[in-house]
């Protein structure tokens, strides 16, 4: 029975590695849940702590984080753009390095995806070999049972819940990114991995993200290292876009192992 189960998981892992097939599955599920079942849910404004979240200015309009994140359902007829939004490729740089770390147990480890918007990121994680029962995600919006509705500033997960946490392009939408880092540290297990990505944008060209006047935004991985300084066992990867070229908009990525 175990052999059949392993063969089953192996076959589906291989199928999910095929970008076109994986993305097609994600899109079909999205159209079914979002348009047919109309299953979209938002973390309610009464629950959302607006002081934690920034305001976004886009196309001469103001958005909160929830309404801004819903832009992934816009302009779906643009096939190239839609494919990119649903194939999870933006997260590849955060999770593919896991394959170079030999202590990860893909059969047993529990992994959390923070702020995936759609299921593309989750199916990409599954393609690495993680079991569905061990994959969770959390977002302010959800259209399927694969994503828990909630706010990463303050989650309902128990202490030491996850072996790996992937947090891509979330921290810079917060006025209190250190609060999120504290929560990530709480819910990750001892010796667990935290993989973080965010976009560095020089202040003089960052016209979309509007922070509270007293906020010091995240713009360098050095701020993450400082916050975690007493809880870092090893830093496996650290690309700081600001340090590399402070005049250019780019992605910063850091992957580290924590100790508690």
Identify the role of each PLM range.
Residues 34-105:
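Class I SAM-dependent methyltransferase Rossmann-like catalytic core
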Residues 109-154:
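Class I SAM-dependent methyltransferase SAM/SAH-binding core
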Residues 150-165:
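A short acidic, Gly/Pro-enriched loop at the edge of an enzyme's catalytic core
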Residues 164-177:
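A short SAM/SAH-binding and catalytic strip from SAM-dependent methyltransferases
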Residues 174-175, 188-190:
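Helix-to-beta-strand junctions that scaffold the AdoMet/dcAdoMet cofactor pocket
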Residues 191-200:
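Conserved beta-strand signature within the Rossmann-like core of class I S-adenosyl-L-methionine
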Residues 206-237:
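Conserved Class I S-adenosyl-L-methionine
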Residues 230-260:
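Core SAM-dependent methyltransferase catalytic element
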């Amino acid at each position: 029975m175990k052999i059949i189960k392993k063969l089953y998981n192996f076959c589906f892992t291989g199928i999910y590695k095929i970008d076109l097939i994986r993305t097609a599955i994600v899109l079909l599920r999205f159209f079914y849940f979002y348009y047919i079942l109309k299953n979209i849910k938002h973390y309610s404004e009464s629950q959302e702590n607006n002081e934690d979240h920034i305001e976004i200015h886009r196309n001469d309009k103001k958005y909160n984080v929830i309404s801004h994140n819903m832009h992934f359902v816009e302009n779906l007829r643009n096939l190239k753009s839609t494919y990119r939004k649903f194939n999870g490729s933006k997260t590849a740089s955060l999770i593919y390095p896991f394959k170079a770390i030999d202590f990860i147990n893909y059969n047993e480890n529990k992994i959390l995806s923070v702020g995936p918007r759609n299921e593309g990121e989750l199916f990409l994680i599954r393609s690495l070999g993680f079991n569905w029962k061990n994959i969770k995600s959390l977002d302010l919006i959800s259209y399927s049972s694969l994503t828990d509705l909630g706010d990463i500033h303050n989650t309902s997960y128990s202490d030491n819940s996850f072996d790996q946490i992937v947090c891509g392009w979330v921290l810079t939408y917060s006025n209190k990114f250190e609060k999120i880092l504290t929560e990530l540290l709480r819910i990750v297990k001892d010796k667990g991995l935290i993989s973080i990505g965010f976009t560095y944008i020089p202040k003089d060209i960052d016209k979309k993200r509007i922070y509270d006047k007293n906020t010091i935004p995240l713009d360098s991985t050095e701020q993450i290292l400082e916050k975690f300084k007493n809880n870092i066992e090893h830093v496996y990867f650290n690309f700081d876009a600001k340090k590399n070229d402070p005049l250019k908009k780019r992605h910063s990525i850091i992957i580290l192992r924590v100790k508690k």
